[in-house]
Amino acid sequence: MLRTTIFAALLAFCVTSIMAQTQFAHTQGKEIVDGAGKPLLLRGTNLGNWLVPEGYMWHLNNGGPESPREIEALITELIGPQRTRDFWHSYRENYITQADIHLIKQCGFNSIRVPLHYKFFESDDAEGFTLLNRVVQWAGQENLYVILDMHAAPGGQTGSNIDDSDGYPWLFSDASAQEHTVAVWQRLARHYRDNSTVLGYDLLNEPIPNYPGLERFNASLEPFYKRLATAIRQVDKHHILILGGAQWDTNFAVFGPPFDNNVVYTFHRYHAPADQTTVQPYVDFRDRYNVPIWLGESGENADDWIAKFVAVLEKNDIGWAFWPYKKMQATTSVVSFPAPEGWDAIIQFSKQPRATSEGAARLKVRPEQPVIDGALAGILNNIPSSKCRENQGYIHVLLPSSTLPTESK
């Protein structure tokens, strides 16, 4: 009887352990599979411009602010520190809501990639967790997977506008930035370790650009990934680790054999030929190491190019997440929001030289305060999904079987 009881207890423990392990999406050879072991081809969109704003998605590029800190500086100049804090709080609360996640599901996507800025996850009770928890909860209700993407790491992994850095990828040579990044990722992993809606962790977005002299950091990339993996695995044994190549997530030559048994390799391709030549190097890598690959970003192109590239990806069983879900007044996103009245004046002002000595000249072309206030209020009014336009052509080339109506709003 005692043996039977012990055996039953051990069996229950083993079954529970197996269930705990397999409720999470994981890798199986060259495939990502769901908790039941069924192959999972990711079809997703990126929630860009939410926690990591980019100037071009506000039509502020071509001489205007591009990075989050530059956009924040512009708005602070226009409305002052306190109102700027209020603006961004409202922006983050309303840019991505439950209605957006529901629409993503309605379109036919099965996953979302969420670009993160480290500054929102500096403590367990930080604002970022409040915002991200809601998105993960809503995604779970819609049976969508969530990929967490470190888009802006401490010190900067690219040294460009997209990582909100000081203009140089200090992450690869600054010990304090590395320690900081490890701590942020371990905090995120500890927080989401038991959440199976979260599919995995995209450890660094587009590290090390192809700028002159920066290739010397390539040799540091995989060792730092190993360091991050060690820290994450101390608190989270379940989630997939997603590793991007050097030079904007294009160069897989930096990788040796996989160092973790639950890892996916991600590549990004923009404005490349929409044919087999673009994906073949990554397919070869997949075959060489028997690991899954995933396209974490692409897009910003004509609908016919996107249709051709999606066909190539799916022919090769490569999951994808196109960029982005939402931005201002554009057709190359799932939805777009209208530019508010007075925004052209803000754009023109944003392009004026910002040197201290140019202060008087800037004041001469500064819009009147009512115009400024109206334009920024218009941004907040226009970003909710109810005010956005669905780009039906874009949606239907990504997801030809989408059940959304083909006519535009």
What are the residue ranges of the model-derived segments?
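Positively charged n-region of N-terminal signal peptides that target proteins for export
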Residues: 1-4
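Extracellular glycoside hydrolase catalytic/binding regions
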Residues: 24-25, 179-328, 332-350
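Active-site mouth of glycoside hydrolases
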Residues: 27-42, 47-240, 245-253
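Aromatic-rich peripheral "rim/lid" segments of glycoside hydrolase catalytic domains that contact
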Residues: 305-409
